């Protein structure tokens, strides 16, 4: 019996030590560093309105259906963050073709003047998470004509707005040039007022 206690005692001490280190100390240190170095990102990159109410996050896309606004990527989960993910069909899967064709048809209804061959792929396909907040600058640009027509905002103003909201690759290396749809639409809303 004494031999069993000799074996169990270090196991219990090691388990408790790692529980405290990994479950308490490490998370507190990482949270403290994140709050000190990049507070906005650590808090979820939230965007507030004039009344200091949260209206979204730069990290999670929103579904814009009003034709006067820029639209983001297609989301099979309807931008519900708790259901992150999408049906990542293989290129050979007929369901992918059906989904893309449906997205193209919806696109054509709202943007009849833009040839289908000019529709950027990111406007008719899902991202891996289904929550992508960004589109390519080209995906924003092909929507300018529709928005200009519906809002009477000159195309040049909308083009400049896209240019101002375009972000480069992180550290010049990671990712693509992109436009955050929520931030772009908030700037558009300021012009419309």
Curated annotation (Swiss-Prot):
One of its GO terms (cellular component) is plasma membrane. The chain crosses the membrane at residues 14-34. Keywords: ATP-binding, Cell membrane, Ion transport, Membrane, Nucleotide-binding, Potassium, Potassium transport, Transmembrane, Transmembrane helix, Transport. It is found in: Cell membrane. It is a single-pass membrane protein. GO terms for molecular function: ATP binding; P-type potassium transmembrane transporter activity. InterPro entries: KdpC. The system is composed of three essential subunits: KdpA, KdpB and KdpC. This is Potassium-transporting ATPase KdpC subunit. The lineage of its organism: Bacteria, Bacillati, Bacillota, Bacilli, Bacillales. The gene is kdpC.
């Amino acid at each position: 019996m004494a031999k069993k206690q000799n074996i169990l005692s270090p196991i219990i001490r090691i388990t408790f030590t790692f529980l405290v280190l990994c479950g308490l100390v490490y998370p507190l240190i990482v949270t403290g560093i994140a709050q000190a170095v990049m507070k906005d990102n650590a808090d979820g990159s939230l965007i507030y309105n004039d009344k200091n109410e949260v209206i979204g996050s730069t990290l999670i896309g929103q579904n814009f259906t009003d034709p006067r606004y820029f639209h983001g990527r297609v989301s099979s989960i309807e931008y519900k963050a708790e259901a992150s993910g999408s049906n990542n069909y293989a290129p050979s899967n007929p369901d992918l073709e059906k989904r893309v064709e449906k997205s193209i048809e919806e696109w054509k209804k709202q943007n009849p003047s833009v040839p289908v061959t000019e529709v950027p792929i990111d406007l008719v396909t899902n991202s891996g998470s289904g929550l992508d907040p960004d589109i390519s600058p080209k995906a924003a640009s092909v929507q300018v004509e529709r928005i200009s027509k519906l809002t009477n905002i000159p195309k040049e103003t909308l083009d400049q707005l896209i240019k101002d909201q375009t972000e480069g690759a992180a550290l010049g290396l990671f990712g693509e040039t992109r436009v955050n749809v929520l931030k772009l639409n908030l700037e558009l809303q300021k012009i419309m007022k």
